[in-house]
């Protein structure tokens, strides 16, 4: 947004699929946040400033094909995955596309109902072909799934709940986006397993959103 004649900018992931004619973002209201305190009050017709080119490291072309594609998110880190789970290309090279998403409280699971009904949706259900699986979790309230998604993978509870095989190097791949501690923990977890990070030159076993990690 333009504030006092100067652009006030923050990095946001695009949550809408690449074939849509609109752009969707997912944000939380930060108390007294310089941008979000203003962003929450915009109205139809108001202008927002966007870059002319999207950048990022969560790119399917940076990953190997495989059995299961895991999307691992905390908080608003789910935004790029909201775009990908509605993308045709996402389902072409994997048997399952599995989204693990944790937030602090239930109300922050803003896309929960949509994601739970994705396979049955009259439009996106034709894209997912039943391949999409969703594991929401909450860390600070009672919920059907509680705790960090890292722990759910470590103890195997997520695999049992979803009826899928445990993550295995050479068969499965992952995309990571969320808080810095979660990103770094999963990065170490996969590297300790012998997995390689993918990039634009070499397809790998996992990718993560570096704008969260390298600050």
Task: Give the ranges of each region predicted by the language model.
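Reductase modules of NAD(P)H-dependent flavoproteins
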Residues: 100, 107-215
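Short coil/loop residues immediately preceding or within conserved phosphate-binding loops
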Residues: 9, 66-67
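Conserved S-adenosyl-L-methionine
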Residues: 66, 90-97
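Ferredoxin-reductase
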Residues: 1-46
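Conserved beta-strand elements of the Class I
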Residues: 69-72
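A short, basic/flexible loop-to-alpha-helix module at the beginning of a structural domain
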Residues: 54-64
């Amino acid at each position: 947004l333009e504030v006092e004649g100067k652009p006030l900018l923050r990095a946001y992931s695009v949550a809408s699929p690449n074939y849509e004619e609109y752009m969707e973002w997912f944000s939380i209201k930060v108390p007294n946040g310089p941008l979000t305190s203003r962003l929450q009050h915009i109205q139809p017709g108001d202008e927002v400033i966007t870059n002319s080119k999207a950048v990022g490291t969560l790119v399917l072309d940076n990953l190997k094909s495989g059995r299961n594609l895991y999307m691992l998110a905390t908080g608003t880190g789910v935004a790029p995955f909201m775009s990908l789970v509605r993308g045709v290309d996402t389902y072409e090279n994997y048997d399952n596309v599995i989204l693990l998403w944790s937030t602090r409280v239930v109300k922050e699971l803003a896309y929960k109902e949509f994601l739970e009904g994705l396979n049955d949706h009259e439009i996106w259900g034709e894209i997912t072909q039943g391949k999409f699986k969703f594991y929401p979790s909450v860390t600070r309230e009672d919920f059907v799934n509680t705790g960090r998604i890292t722990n759910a993978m470590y103890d195997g509870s997520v695999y049992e709940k979803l009826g899928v095989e445990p993550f295995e190097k050479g068969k499965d791949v992952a995309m990571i986006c969320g808080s810095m501690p979660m990103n770094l923990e999963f990065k170490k977890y996969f590297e300790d397993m012998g997995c390689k990070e993918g990039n634009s030159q070499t397809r790998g076993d996992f990718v993560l959103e570096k704008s969260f990690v390298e600050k």
